[in-house]
Design a protein with these regions (language model features):
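Positively charged n-region of N-terminal signal peptides that target proteins for export
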Residues: 1-6
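Bacterial N-terminal signal peptides
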Residues: 7-17
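Cationic-aromatic interfacial patches
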Residues: 24-145, 151
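Surface-exposed, glycine-biased beta-strand/turn segments
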Residues: 143-255
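Zn2+-dependent peptidoglycan hydrolase active-site motif and core
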Residues: 226, 241-275, 303-308
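Short, well-structured beta-strand-loop connectors
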Residues: 237-247, 276-294
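Conserved, short, structured surface segments that act as functional micro-motifs
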Residues: 257-260, 267, 283-327
Length: 327
């Protein structure tokens, strides 16, 4: 009997070892260490992202002089995708999607545009996209399509805040900071400031708390995680993910010492919790230029780094953006 019990115990241990946890349904093994948007890193580290190969494109619609192609079939909440318009003698291309005006950027003989869905965008098949193509002779054509938005994959986290940190649960502070940032990422620079090497992580270190996580603080305050956390220590140099222009460099309540960079065509990257910053508003920065050093400023209980990315005014998954093929 003892031999049988021992055998059953060994089998149970093996099964528990190999069975993966479903992050969508399983809460984290321990709550975040603080009460903010960006807790000290928790959970298992995620592998560093790698840029994908060029995917196949699908022609969605066409006129007699231009055609619209998608590099995607459906758009998950919180993600970014790529579109392409091909044709002869095209001068410029713009699109309207979910109230956002999207400028396409030229690469060789094609025009490419970034399309994004916010992490709380309702799902559905019939999301109208209108693409306006202007030709060199001044004539125009419109290419109409529908974009399907599907559910994103996000985890849930319950966070307990100590009584002496109750000020972190102030919803007005949360909303005020988000509104301030959204007024910046909602602007548009009709210029591509990044180069063909694309974007990269600001710190080459383990990824931890993911984008889009549903967070409930003390059972009352509900928030969403607008970026990814990167495990680090104090004083590590932070690099610009791509070339761009600094539109904010200062201190925020939640994000602490913070830098926001405009990369053009609706793409912004945000860097939070610096101990020191080395750039100023209006400054042009190169890819891999050091912006400052990591710290624990703002709403955090320990050194870590929060990196976020916005496209067309929406916070999107910065790691998915890195993994997406870009021309």
């Amino acid at each position: 009997m003892k031999s049988l019990q021992l055998l059953l115990l060994v089998l149970m241990v093996c099964l528990l070892t190999i069975a993966p946890l479903n992050a969508q349904d399983q809460p984290p093994t321990e709550p975040p260490a603080d009460g903010g948007l960006d807790p000290a890193p928790v959970g298992t580290a995620v592998p560093l992202p790698t840029r994908g190969a060029r995917p196949a494109s699908f022609m969605i619609t066409q006129s007699d002089r231009a055609a619209l192609h998608f590099f995607f079939q459906a758009l998950p909440q919180g993600e970014t995708a790529l579109m392409r318009v091909v044709g002869n003698e095209i001068a410029n291309v713009r699109a309207l999607f979910l109230g956002d005006l999207i400028d396409f950027f030229p690469v060789d003989d094609n025009f490419y545009g970034l399309i994004a869905a916010g992490m709380e965008q309702p799902t559905g098949r019939n999301n109208p996209l209108a693409v306006y193509v202007t030709f060199t002779d001044g004539t125009r054509t419109t290419l109409d399509a529908n974009v399907e938005i599907v559910l994103g994959s996000f985890i849930r986290q319950n966070v307990t805040v100590a009584p002496d940190r109750g000020y972190l649960l102030d919803i007005e502070t949360e909303q005020s900071e988000l509104a301030r940032l959204e007024s910046m990422i909602g602007t548009y620079t009709d210029e591509r400031l990044w180069d063909e090497t694309g974007f990269q992580l600001p710190i080459m270190a383990a990824l931890t708390s993911p984008f889009g996580a549903f967070r409930t603080f003390n059972g009352t305050l509900n928030t969403r995680h607008t970026g990814w956390d990167i495990r680090t220590t104090l004083g590590v140099p932070v690099m610009a993910s791509a070339a761009g222009r600094v539109v904010f460099a200062g201190t925020l309540a939640i994000r602490g010492n913070y830098v926001l960079i405009d990369h053009g065509y609706g793409v912004f990257t945000g860097y939070a919790h610096f101990s020191t910053t080395h750039v100023t508003r209006g400054q042009e920065v190169a890819k891999e230029q050091v912006l400052g050093t990591t710290g624990d400023t703002g709403r955090t209980s320990g050194p870590h780094f929060h990196w976020e990315l916005a496209v067309n005014g929406d916070w999107v998954d910065s790691i998915q953006f890195l993994e997406m093929w870009m021309p």
